Curated annotation (Swiss-Prot):
Species per Swiss-Prot/TrEMBL record: Mycolicibacterium vanbaalenii (strain DSM 7251 / JCM 13017 / BCRC 16820 / KCTC 9966 / NRRL B-24157 / PYR-1) (Mycobacterium vanbaalenii)
GO biological process, one term: L-tryptophan biosynthetic process
Lineage: Bacteria, Bacillati, Actinomycetota, Actinomycetes, Mycobacteriales
NCBIfam families: PRK00278.1-1, PRK00278.2-4
Superkingdom of this protein's organism: Bacteria
Protein name stated in the entry: Indole-3-glycerol phosphate synthase
Family as reported in the entry's similarity comment: Belongs to the TrpC family.
Length: 272
């Protein structure tokens, strides 16, 4: 084994935090909370609607940049995103590197009527029931963080609760694993979570090899409409944008600009 990667150290912290939460709220309790939660919203309908879907992210910090934005009211930010035309709101709940929390997820879920994505490093079944209990309609599964049998069982559990998994990949080999697991939504992250380096050409390399029935999401590296159009040209159905929105000064307008570009007749349409 080589030296520990950034991803390894994040997951080590996540495992400790999950164990602490499970000690406070048992798996049985969190399963009961999940059963009582309102039914999940239709994520696939949001992603398949015409135009490029914008998934707008509530993101306070990142391992690569540190603190990004002081978000006093995540609910207000989420409403601004929804008003701007975002189809889905992504909420970071990892606390050590991204300064997120389940409180942020609760606040956003209560504030908007569109689907909400729990963005975290999901490594245990507990976190899936926890996501549902806190109102998530969608959650992130990162192929690089999971052995294949674990990926497959977590994906199956996510779907059994009526949620949709955004299965994240960074290489062609990971994309093959995502497909083998049965992913219906695949996100290509331009950022390598092991090194934090960004490779904007990553999506254009991987997306053409994905079957036409798979929804393709471009993650990381969207700084404005030019990046959205480039990703659309490479086959994106959706873009996930965080840093570019929380640092924009006017998140509603920043989302609206992306949505308008993604709906424009000149915007490339994915081949289906």
């Amino acid at each position: 084994m080589g030296s520990a990667t950034v991803l390894d150290s994040i997951i080590e912290g996540v495992r400790a935090d999950v164990a602490a939460r499970e000690a406070a709220v048992s798996m049985d309790e969190v399963k009961e909370q999940a059963k009582r939660a309102p039914a999940p919203l239709d994520v696939m309908a949001a992603l398949r609607a015409s135009g490029i879907a914008v998934i707008a992210e509530v993101k306070r910090a990142s391992p690569s940049r540190g603190a990004l934005a002081s978000i006093a009211d995540p609910a207000e930010l989420a409403r601004a995103y929804e008003d701007g035309g975002a189809r889905i709101i992504s909420v970071l709940t990892e606390q050590r590197r991204f300064n997120g929390s389940l409180d942020d997820l609760d606040a956003v879920r209560a504030a908007v009527s569109i689907p909400v994505l729990r963005k975290d490093f999901i490594v245990r079944p507990y976190q899936i029931h926890e996501a549902r209990a806190h109102g998530a309609d969608m959650l992130l599964l990162i192929v690089a963080a999971l052995e294949q049998p674990v990926l497959e069982s977590l994906l199956e559990r996510t779907e059994s609760l009526g949620m949709t998994a955004l299965v994240e990949v960074h290489t062609e080999e990971e994309a093959d694993r995502a497909l083998q697991a049965g992913a219906s939504v695949i996100g290509v992250n331009a950022r390598d979570l092991k090194t934090l380096e960004v490779d904007r050409d990553c999506f254009a390399r991987i997306a053409p090899g994905l079957p036409s029935n798979v929804i393709r999401v471009a993650e990381s590296g969207v700084r404005g409409t030019a990046d959205l159009l480039a990703y659309a040209g490479a086959g994106a159905d959706a873009v996930l944008v965080g840093e570019g929105l929380v640092t924009s000064g006017d998140p509603r307008s920043a989302v609206a600009d992306l949505v308008t570009a993604g709906a424009h007749p000149s915007c490339p349409k994915p081949a289906r």
